[in-house]
């Protein structure tokens, strides 16, 4: 769902 996409984006930023 949309929330899954949001979490994926947040995870990507967290990897920075």
Curated annotation (Swiss-Prot):
Record-listed Leucine amide modification sites: 16
Tissue: Expressed by the skin dorsal glands.
Example of a GO biological process term: defense response to fungus
Principal place of residence: secreted
Cellular component terms per the entry's GO annotation: extracellular region; membrane; other organism cell membrane
Keywords: Amidation, Amphibian defense peptide, Antibiotic, Antimicrobial, Fungicide, Lipid-binding, Membrane, Secreted, Target cell membrane, Target membrane
SS bonds (residue pairs): none
Molecular function, one GO term: lipid binding
Post-translational modification: C-terminal amidation enhances antibacterial activity. This increase may be due to stabilization of the alpha-helical structure at the membrane interface.
Family, as annotated: Belongs to the frog skin active peptide (FSAP) family. Aurein subfamily.
Protein name in the entry: Aurein-2.5
Species for this entry: Ranoidea raniformis (Southern bell frog)
């Amino acid at each position: 769902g949309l929330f899954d996409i949001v979490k994926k984006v947040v995870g990507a930023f967290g990897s920075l």
